[in-house]
Amino acid sequence: MLATAKTEVVVLTAQKWFPNPFQTQVVDQHIESRRALKYLGVTIDSKLTFRDQIVSVATRAATTVANLSRLMPNVGGPRSSCRRALMGVANSIVLYGVEIWGEALKVEKYRKQLASVQRRGALRIACAYRTVSEAAVLVISGVTPIDLLGHERKRIWDARRAGEGPLKDVRTREREETFALWQERWETGETGRWTYRLIGQIRDWVLRDCGEVDYYLTQFLAGHGQFNAYLHRMGIRNDPYCFYCPGVADSAEHTFFDCQRWSEIRLRWREEKEVPQRRSGEIRRNGGISCRSSVEGAWYCEVMLTRSRSIIRYKRGEGFSE
């Protein structure tokens, strides 16, 4: 028997002439239609735009990201792989029922609303400055863009309904399709170009079997950190020039590849024998980072930025020296 007191109605129509609200009678109860209602956890609106669903999950996910962020300081705290697993909770909230409403992600304003929440989580995973672009921080942290994840899940669901082979094969195929779409977006993007020079192939970077990003390595990969060119852009330094190379902008590229102040460290890194199984990897300024160099690269970047920070603080009169 229908419980009329608990009954809700939403009229699915795009016709402007249709009366809104619409009233109907069930038994002895008059029921007025609503603009949207929640059914099995998905908010359905009368025009099937799923705007209310996206606003709802974005708000809930933002709260989750904010709470988890308290566990993830820039220095210390969980490793990036653990951070990624924790932030997966926010993805689960956002992507619930995406097989039904996934087409709404093709609307740019809806995509941006969810991407904004995901970006905040990716910043915590990579321990990055908040000025790092969405494209760059997602690559550095290894987090697939939320709209591509949503479309992937919808394609998998459609393939299962069509009986297109074993689920494992379908998932593998669609994951490769997502990597291809992400790679195309990465290659044609306008932001994160320094990161693109270092991490050209997303699939290789995300699926690497060694190396964790942290506060120090992320500064190198993003180009946002203890570099005078960046600090000058943020209004912290009076000029963008290197302390040790007059007239040369102190960018991440200059610090890690050219600055004579760090030539001894660069040479020591190249000759280091402590990690022989990783020796075949290298970092190239235009050719990208070999995944096999991640362990060496993390050590190299941490030493470089720790020393750089000490020197910068000393120059600012805070009492830090080498």
Regions flagged by a language model, labelled:
Residues Q29-W101:
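Basic, alpha-helical interaction scaffolds
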Residues I100-K112:
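Acidic, serine/threonine/proline-rich low-complexity intrinsically disordered regions
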Residues A136-Y216:
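Extended C-terminal regions of large enzymes
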Residues W205, C210-E322:
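Family-specific functional microsites
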Residues L2-R35:
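Short, conserved micro-motifs composed of acidic
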Residues A5-Q15, A85-L86, K109-L114, A136-V143:
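A glycine-rich phosphate-binding loop feature that marks nucleotide/adenosyl-phosphate handling sites
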Residues Y110-T131:
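Two-metal-ion acidic nuclease core segments, chiefly of the RNase H-like superfamily
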